[in-house]
Amino acid sequence: MESKLFTPVTFGPLTLRNRTIRSAAFESMCPGNAPSDMLLDYHRSVAAGGIGMTTVAYAAVTQSGLSFDRQLWMRPEIIPGLRRLTDAIHAEGAAAGIQLGHCGNMSHKSICGCMPVGASSGFNLYSPTFVRGLRADELPEMARAYGRSVNLAREAGFDSVEIHAGHGYLISQFLSPSTNHRKDEFGGSLQNRMRFMDMVMEEVMKAAGSDMAVLVKMNMRDGFRGGMELDETMQVARRLEQSGAHALVLSGGFVSKAPMYVMRGEMPIRSMTHYMTCWWLKYGVRTVSYTHLTLPTKRI
């Protein structure tokens, strides 16, 4: 009997030739924050291997959203290069997706050109740097930046967009009580903490229209005491469904809490094996799961 993995699947307006998706893992192949031939060749080779869709990773919706110096930044002048990339992917029979996001406080002035911004002000050990909390009157424009990036993705020929709302980046910083210490209508209760995500999704769905698939990557658990837990993340998932998202990419963890980044220590293999089993999949119905860790069975 043929595996269901290799049968077509439809979410929203998009049908894939099979159920395999190259997840939006950061490539670091965009010198000058623009697509390169290396990025094109990489995704073309993935598509040629028979995958259903390959996802270009972690494109910043604004310059302030950049975490890395070889990260894609969505702006009109890079559209011709992105069009070459999507044409190459489509020529191999695969769909082309792109992940859109903003790093929030996960940056440094030397990368993003300004003092990093986030849900709340403070000091981020990851960078390390001081962070300015976004004012409430700045949030509508930030949400519109997501919508503009979706329009640019459409112009570049992408079939789907994936909104990054996990891993401790900007949307996740608003959602998590660990990083959202606001006293206004965007902080406090979960309903308030979801308010910025709601604004983003409204702009995204408006720009996506009826012919572009929208995925959202979200945490099912932040992975540390004081972070989001399953009871709240299930409510976030339902809200995203109500917003019109066609699929959820279920994940977990906070980059800024990872000891290999903050303290440059050894990876916490024992605790990471908890995520190896993808325990959250039982909570999904129509889901796209994030690639799990493959670990050796013996110490090496």
PLM-predicted stretches and their roles:
Residues 1-293:
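Flavin-dependent oxidoreductase catalytic cores
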Residues 292-300:
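Single conserved hydrophobic/aromatic residue that forms the stacking wall/gate
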